[in-house]
Amino acid sequence: VIPMFEKETGIQVVYEEYETNEIMYPKVQSGAIAYDVVCPSDYMIQRMIENDLLAKINFDNIPNIKYIGDTYLEQSRQFDPDNLYSVPYCWGTVGILYNKTMVDEPIDSWSVLWDEKYKDNILMQDSVRDAFAVALKYIGASLNSTDLNELEEAKQLLIDQKPLVQAYVIDQVRDKMIGNEAAIGVIYSGEAIYTQAENPNLEYVIPKEGSNLWIDSWVIPKNAQHKENAEKFINFLCRPDIAKMNFDYITYSTPNTGARKLIEDPAIRNSKIAFPEPEDLVN
């Protein structure tokens, strides 16, 4: 969609990817490169707001915000209390993807990640945030816990788990699960949709103990050199047809109500992985 934006506006886009929020943060913090638009995750946006790294968005320049569902704007208040600094782009859950031909029974709990019979068949996310989220939820704590005893217990669980883990991965979990190289993997819901299309033996579940519902959003760094152009870009991405094209490409759930209506395949439009029921998100 970037060439479309460039053609429509005459604005040239320099596009750069990063693998984790933790890689992105020091780049923005240092100010070495004056990024105009960045797409961090919820917890990192909160950190950036607290450290005065973000500019308030002029929503007069983003009329397409009307297509972003109220549910997601309300969810965003957990990290952007007054909805001043961010515009939701995509969202999802973290759960377990398992191969039905390689496990003994349906999975419904994080406890399977500590089951010794699956030694060397478990894939974990190479992310401090997601690894701790799994362990904290497993012990019944909040994934945002700051309790030192809970954090220490979660840390010890992850240390104890390490001998059972085949690999700590990010994008590779998708290919390994499709290729039957592991029985169980911690995965983002958007990746799960793609993997199931490639391998029908794969099943995705949000464990009963609860999970992480995350939102990635567009923000504008305080030192942005082209703030109005950044707002034009965000508004463009909020257009339903553009948001739908992005959903088709990345398969992560869209908060754009107009885009969801444009999804042709009812199996995807009504997918419980892409768009879980509210009761499935209680925890």
Give the residues covered by each predicted segment.
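Hinge/lid segment of periplasmic solute-binding proteins
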Residues: 42, 46-91, 104-111
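Ligand-binding pocket segment of bilobal, Venus flytrap-like solute-binding proteins
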Residues: 123-127, 131, 135, 143-207
